[in-house]
Amino acid sequence: MKLAYWMYAGPAHIGTLRVASSFQNVHAIMHAPLGDDYFNVMRSMLERERDFTPVTASIVDRHVLARGSQEKVVENITRKDKEEKPDLILLTPTCTSSILQEDLQNFVDRASIESNSDVILADVNHYRVNELQAADRTLEQVVRYYIQKANKQGNLNLTKSKTPSANIIGIFTLGFHHQHDCREIRRLFQDLGIEINEIIPEGNSVNNLKNLPRAWFNFIPYREIGLMTAKYLEKEFQMPYIANIPMGIVDTATCIREIQKIVSTLQKPMDFESYIDKQTRFVSQAAWFSRSIDCQNLTGKKAIVFGDGTHAAYMTKILAREMGIRVACAGTYCKHDAHWFREEVQEYCDEVLITDDHTEVGNMIARIEPAAIFGTQMERHIGKRLDIPCGVISAPVHIQNFPLGYRPFLGYEGANQIADLVYNSFTLGMEDHLLEIFGGHDTKEVITKSLSTNSDLTWSADGLNELKKIPGFVRGKIKRNTEKFARENGINEITVEVMYAAKEALNT
């Protein structure tokens, strides 16, 4: 545990609650003190849904600490069973309530006797895993529970579908553009003649999990959540899975060829090459755009990419391979998947950063001074302070990245959206010059951009006037170099003379 005002991945119980609230008719009981129960508010604020968040907090208060939690937890489970009549009640502690070291499995066993619903304790170590790892583990636990239950009852559906079919595993509530990506994947599979067997967990019922073995293969759109479930199904039922994400023109084609290979081994050979060619050359605009003069203007520009493993890795490859943009640094906060990430990006970027500390990311951005950043909401904040444009490509995000319109990141339409995002994130070449030349009406003041919240430097009036004369595209860099020089030499006020002294010092 650590104290931080910004976390890229939340605590483990958030991942478990995301799984529970993604399924239909599943209720979560969160055994937690006040302060840990913000999930309901967060989901209600961010997700564009009309239903209530199915999470109840069983509050740990002074009475619980005096008498123990069993009575209260069991009462909450049985009460929700009678009120909501859910198919499953999922009990989870938080990292705070885990300190009490209570036997929650015993509470679950007792509540199961009095409840008509299935009751499960989330099998997650709250001190060792983060939100994404916990969600991955909880989904696998729920799937395993219902597969084993169906097997005992003799109603497990092991008969394969007549036509090629797939399960899509890993579409979640509060996911980054998950609903849009799901629609795009469904459309892609429909074009390829592949039936959708089940989509889990978003919008599905736990009672349908017994149908998972019907599918020919499993498709994992994001490796952060869903991979454990796919590996379990592969081990139990020899079901192949695809974890090659269709993000960008090149990797979408690779993913389709992988589907072709799996389907062809199970029935007569299929050929999707003509579909790939048609989509790449005539339907998708991204391939054409990458060869246009507009995109060529971006060639060689420096960018930084940071986010979850899936989005950061594939975004790095899109920028480097498809658009000719130099990725100065690619990074992820998924430290548990660092080996895979390095393997994916090391040949497409200058350096790799694996960290969950936002200050390290901020310092790296300030040091490299890229033309654009592609990251999370935090990198967007950093970019604003350093006057560097930022395109958001990964969770964690705020409300503006839960759009009402259709904005997928996967498939051929996703490639179009990414091309737009990339181009619009870079400052257009003549924009700053035109503002400088014709901007007599422009009242924008040049302000100090720094990652430090307590700047100890002031700019004199003549210093600011001199700074305004410098073209916008290099102004930020000169300003930071001047401030660095001033700090190193103990100067508190920056004048024109200090600016020239800093320039001379830099040139020597």
Swiss-Prot record:
InterPro entries: ChlB/BchB/BchZ, LI-POR_suB-like_C, Nase/OxRdtase_comp1, P-CP_red_C, Protochl_reductB, Protochlorophyllide_Rdtase. The active site is at D294 (proton donor). It comes from the Eukaryota. Pfam families: Oxidored_nitro, PCP_red. It is found in: Plastid, Chloroplast. GO terms for molecular function: 4 iron, 4 sulfur cluster binding; ATP binding; metal ion binding; oxidoreductase activity, acting on iron-sulfur proteins as donors; oxidoreductase activity, acting on the CH-CH group of donors, iron-sulfur protein as acceptor. Pathway: Porphyrin-containing compound metabolism; chlorophyll biosynthesis (light-independent). The lineage of its organism: Eukaryota, Viridiplantae, Streptophyta, Charophyceae, Charales. Component of the dark-operative protochlorophyllide reductase (DPOR) that uses Mg-ATP and reduced ferredoxin to reduce ring D of protochlorophyllide (Pchlide) to form chlorophyllide a (Chlide). This reaction is light-independent. The NB-protein (ChlN-ChlB) is the catalytic component of the complex. This is Light-independent protochlorophyllide reductase subunit B. Binds 1 [4Fe-4S] cluster per heterodimer. The cluster is bound at the heterodimer interface by residues from both subunits. Belongs to the ChlB/BchB/BchZ family. Keywords: 4Fe-4S, ATP-binding, Chlorophyll biosynthesis, Chloroplast, Iron, Iron-sulfur, Metal-binding, Nucleotide-binding, Oxidoreductase, Photosynthesis, Plastid. GO terms for biological process: light-independent chlorophyll biosynthetic process; photosynthesis, dark reaction. Its cofactor is [4Fe-4S] cluster. Protochlorophyllide reductase is composed of three subunits; ChlL, ChlN and ChlB. Forms a heterotetramer of two ChlB and two ChlN subunits. Its EC number is 1.3.7.7. Its main location: plastid. PANTHER family: LIGHT-INDEPENDENT PROTOCHLOROPHYLLIDE REDUCTASE SUBUNIT B. The keyword Iron applies. Substrate binds at G429, M430. It is an enzyme of class 1 (oxidoreductase). It catalyses: chlorophyllide a + oxidized 2[4Fe-4S]-[ferredoxin] + 2 ADP + 2 phosphate = protochlorophyllide a + reduced 2[4Fe-4S]-[ferredoxin] + 2 ATP + 2 H2O. [4Fe-4S] cluster binds at D36. One of its GO terms (cellular component) is chloroplast.
